[in-house]
Design a protein with these regions (language model features):
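Conserved glycine-rich cofactor-binding loop
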Residues: 15-17
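Substrate-binding pocket helix/loop in short-chain dehydrogenase/reductase
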Residues: 99-100, 107-109, 193, 201
Length: 244
């Protein structure tokens, strides 16, 4: 197991849902965690409390990651104050229902700005510090990168881009930095989905349940400990990818 105690992590979108679980798990390994948020200030404060309670330390930082300068400033400030960066988790994402024929340029741009552009420029800015620490980048992709979801075509396209980015950066940044991704299935029910939607998903998933944040946490911890793994996209979807 990799010793993470006292090391430094940055988790984007850590104010709620899966991002919070990832941040708290890193705290439980003794890390100092920068809890990034944009709109969920109270949620970020709660995440920081949970990180501390788990045995780590935390700070919160607000940034609109769609603005590259804000994303870069967050990395710069963390490295300047802590002196290092060991783990970057690109978890922040935007998933909008955008059926073909109803997709607006505004929604398209918002998803690509956060899901793809922000993750790339954060990784680029963090690379010198991660190289010095022989650190790791973990990107949160999505099963939608490999499946076709008719009402979420642009979202799936952004996650396919995250997969390609992961593989390319793994090659470019080796050997000092490992870059991997996690492609979850449905982990927690997306906002606006009904219990009927949930039941349908359970019935079409081989393991007959939805995912939990802890499932993604387990994948993240494996990838952090797996020193001979890079460029991997670990699918965590209850077996949905083997249905066909």
């Amino acid at each position: 197991m990799t010793e993470l105690g006292g090391r430094v992590a940055l988790v984007t979108g850590a104010g709620r849902r899966v991002g919070r679980a990832l941040a708290v798990a890193l705290g439980a390994r003794g890390m100092h965690v920068l809890v990034h948020y944009n709109a969920s200030s109270d949620g970020a404060d709660e995440t920081a409390r949970l990180v501390t309670r788990a045995g780590g330390s935390a700070e919160v930082f607000r940034a609109d990651l769609a603005v590259v300068a804000e994303a870069e400033r967050m990395v710069d400030q963390l490295v300047a104050t802590r002196g290092a960066l060991d783990v970057l988790v690109n978890s922040a994402a935007l998933m909008l229902r955008t059926p073909v024929g109803e997709t607006s340029v505004t929604d398209w741009d918002a998803m690509f700005a956060l899901n793809v552009r922000a993750a790339y420029f954060l990784s680029q800015r963090a690379a010198p510090a991660l190289r010095a620490s022989r650190g790791s980048i973990i990107n949160i992709a999505d099963l939608a990168a490999f499946e076709t979801w008719p009402a979420y075509v642009p979202h799936g396209m952004t996650k396919a881009a995250v997969v390609q980015m992961t593989r390319a950066l793994a090659r470019v940044l080796a050997p000092e930095i490992r870059v991997n991704a996690i492609a979850p299935g449905v982990v927690l029910l997306p906002e606006g989905w009904s219990e009927a939607d949930a039941e349908h998903l359970r019935g079409t998933t081989p393991l007959r349940r939805l995912g939990a944040p802890e499932d993604v946490v387990g994948a993240m911890l494996y990838l952090l400990d797996a020193g001979y793994v890079t460029g991997e996209v670990l699918t965590v979807d209850g077996g949905r990818h083997v249905r066909s």
